[in-house]
């Protein structure tokens, strides 16, 4: 699959062959949902906590004697039926992460990249290290397109590139090793450098 390579002026400077096993995979919404749910579950902090009967401070004495009061039998004022009492089966601090097969994760990445490619929302850029030094340069580049948000993926980048992109709310900079389904789907346009394409093909094949 032959795709044009552009420079920062949006001029065509060459072509690159994209592997159809990565950039032309059938659309699988079920796989995308599995991977996105897995990513969101790993992102959760899991710091929710409700106090059990052992966590509540207070007396441990029996409220009243067992019999001959006409009232229901009680063993503790910290029981859940009392005001200020414990919570039964409440949330506890835990990790929400779970494992997902590597083949499924890789397939989700292929499906997401193929989806952007089929919608003509995938751009191949020659390089960003030399060209993206100032924020105005990045802004001038993205103004050439009508997309709402941009995800720029490169194999590696220097500090000046980070500084030039971080003030733009609709531009996200990502290293190739951090390429993920959630970020690809959340951005309107994906910009890959030539180096990132080669690393992705090595990683996913």
UniProtKB/Swiss-Prot annotation:
GO terms for cellular component: ribonucleoprotein complex; ribosome. This is Large ribosomal subunit protein uL4. GO terms for biological process: translation. One of the primary rRNA binding proteins, this protein initially binds near the 5'-end of the 23S rRNA. It is important during the early stages of 50S assembly. It makes multiple contacts with different domains of the 23S rRNA in the assembled 50S subunit and ribosome. Part of the 50S ribosomal subunit. Belongs to the universal ribosomal protein uL4 family. It comes from the Bacteria. Residues 62-71 have a biased composition (Basic residues). InterPro entries: Ribosomal_uL4, Ribosomal_uL4-like, Ribosomal_uL4_dom_sf. The keyword Ribosomal protein applies. Residues 54-78 are annotated as: Disordered. NCBIfam families: rplD_bact. GO terms for molecular function: rRNA binding; structural constituent of ribosome. The gene is rplD. Pfam families: Ribosomal_L4 (PF00573). The keyword Ribonucleoprotein applies. Keywords: Ribonucleoprotein, Ribosomal protein, RNA-binding, rRNA-binding.
